[in-house]
Amino acid sequence: MKSTRKRDRSPKTYTRLTHPLVRDSRDEPFRRATWEEALDRAARGLGAARGAFGMFSCARATNEMNYVAQKFARVVMGTHNVDSCNRTCHAPSVAGLSAAFGSGGGTSSYEEIEHTDLIVMWGSNARFAHPIFFQHVLKGIHNGARMYAVDPRRTSTAEWAESWLGLNVGTDIPMAHAIGREIVHAGLVNEAFVRRATTGFEEYRELVEPWTLSLAEKVTGVPAAAIRELAHAYARAERAQLCWTLGITEHHNGTDNVRALINLSLLTGQVGRYGAGMQPLRGQNNVQGGGDMGAIPNRLPGFQDILDPAVRLKFESAWDTVLQPRHGMTLTEMFEAMEDGSLRAVYCIGENPAQSEADSDQAVRRLSGLDFLVVQDIFLTKTAELADVVLPATAGWAETEGTTTNSERRVQRVRRALTPPGEAREDIDILCDLAARLGHDWKYADAEAVWNELRSLSPTTTA
């Protein structure tokens, strides 16, 4: 029997925030407030939870906002409990690339893929999810590049590939190891590069030795001939690009997945030359920048190690503070700490975890159990509906001055094109006003002043 009830498929309409909102108790509705009242309330609530505080920063906001947000957490609140979706989606890429190259970003520019000879899209549907990048891919194909797609699904990206390797979910490492073993046994290792620029080759050879093509076929579901073809094509190419996204990183063993791909690049010397490299494709406009700015619990700006005494001393001198020699809590750990009561207040900027977390019901329950929640956003999101104080911010892509950093680590200027509605204010100004109420008088004339402070502290942005 066919149902006659029509399902409403229209998207949820969000209300643009134009004025600060506060509530006098959790049982009462929001009421409009002045900025003075809202900031005073936010400062009192956060100040009372200095030892049990977490900051959610935003990968869609500017570099400058993310820098000031992590500084607020570390200097004003005395904690490294700061995180954002830039870590939750691509932390494995940062971990793997940092271990191999000392920096948690891709090694190539977008333009280089137009002039490469071979493209491997692994766990990435770039045609759908990264349309700007895929325009460069199409130019590369037009210029003669061959493309292979490794993905459990035959995606719209795979439709452009010369060959689609539809591996079973979770078998990326067996596939990569089989490719590596075939390259070794076929005598296709770039021995000069391996000797000059790598360590651990003998250990790697022993690691991949069990992964014969026939075993890999049984485990991955991909024909041995197809695996062999990709191995030879990648190793023999004069220049090859290896690209991945969340199909590689969002696994419990995501970092190992990334390292398995990096090893293929090192094995063949497909890195460090124009047109040859690795590209982790980021999901939002400033995912790369959020990590670069230190809006993560285990790194300071420039991916500098919190556990390094010399690094801490540099930041302590610049910020006139003392930094704890330990990592903060990740977003997941912060939600767990809400459950056990060790995290009592959260300052959430531009994120909507009440809707984006895998278990949204659990997220709502835990956020509702906080002593104090401040949300700074442009819309009254589901998370904002749970807040004690809501602060209206400017949109990061049309109403703000600053910069963002894309997947190829290109820093791009953002200029204000529209006047913010109502009383909406710049994120940085809001953060600085809150910091002042909590005893830290930061004077940034504009976003450029923030950028210049960052440049003085981060080796990756000194140019």
List the predicted regions and their residue ranges.
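N-terminal export/assembly segments and adjacent metallocofactor-ligating motifs
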Residues: 1-186, 196, 223, 265, ...
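Residues at alpha-helix caps and immediate loop-helix transition turns in enzyme cores, especially N-
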Residues: 65-69, 132-133, 256-257, 358-360, ...
